[in-house]
Amino acid sequence: MPETGQEPPSAPPPPPPPKESFYIKNLLNGDPPKAAPKQPRALFAPSGKADGSGFALSQVGDLSFPRFEIPAPRFALSAHCLERAQTWWYPYALTPAGAHLPRTEAAEKSLLRDSSPASGTDRDSPEPLLQGGDAEQKERDPKSPAEIVLEESDSEEGKKEGGAEDWKKREESPEKKPCRKKKTRTVFSRSQVFQLESTFDMKRYLSSSERAGLAASLHLTETQVKIWFQNRRNKWKRQLAAELEAANLSHAAAQRIVRVPILYHENSGAESSAAGGGGPGPQPLLTFPHPVYYSHPSVTSVPLLRPV
């Protein structure tokens, strides 16, 4: 008889669940099955060749990074455009293996030639529109090249002629400096001048009432009469100064003339003896019947010399 106290054998306990590790390495490598190590690619590798999408960050060296996919419609560029988009001044080029190599001159020339606007790319302006516009312009203005050349030559000749005329004008006319406008000079008639001169001889200065009466009688303005008298007084003063200078010169010339007395006279004793004896007495050596004048500024007087 089986023992009632014995219990049937229990099932073995289930195995404990695997412990989840929260290390950064395990989080980065989230996929439990380890894939075969891939060959390292460049940091920025165009993923369009493999996946048909935009750029993706891939593994570099031994470190692995999560791949951030960029949708293709937002950033879809071909490999050719990416190669051309490299900065021209950057002296290194990225190789597929991720190594930096210096660019050669041939590579720089090719990049510059590709980036020049003369290179035929898909982004160039459409030629059919320009051709159509040129055709319409030719239809509107149908001129041959010869006519265009003739028109240009005519315009150049006109410019040359105009330049020559301007040069002649500059030569003929002296440099005009900005000067104040000259006042017009009043022209007096003979009768007016005669009346003014007669009034000036009588009176050098006129009062305001006399000036007003004279101006009314001569049909002139008071300002004209006043200016005429001022000019006439200046002229009169210049004449007086000239006359005074001439008088001074004549007076100075008269002062230079000096009177020289007679040097020899007849002897009084000889005259008396000659009168008593009746014979002619001795004549003086020099006799001057009239006084002689000498012009000498320094000689003032000469003493009278008598014979011994």
UniProtKB/Swiss-Prot annotation:
Keyword Transport: no
Ranges of the DNA-binding region feature: 181-240
BP terms from Gene Ontology: cell differentiation; nervous system development; regulation of transcription by RNA polymerase II
Family indicated by similarity: Belongs to the HMX homeobox family.
Cellular localisation: Nucleus
UniProt name for this protein: Homeobox protein HMX3
Species this protein is from: Gallus gallus
GO cellular component: nucleus
Lineage: Eukaryota, Metazoa, Chordata, Craniata, Vertebrata
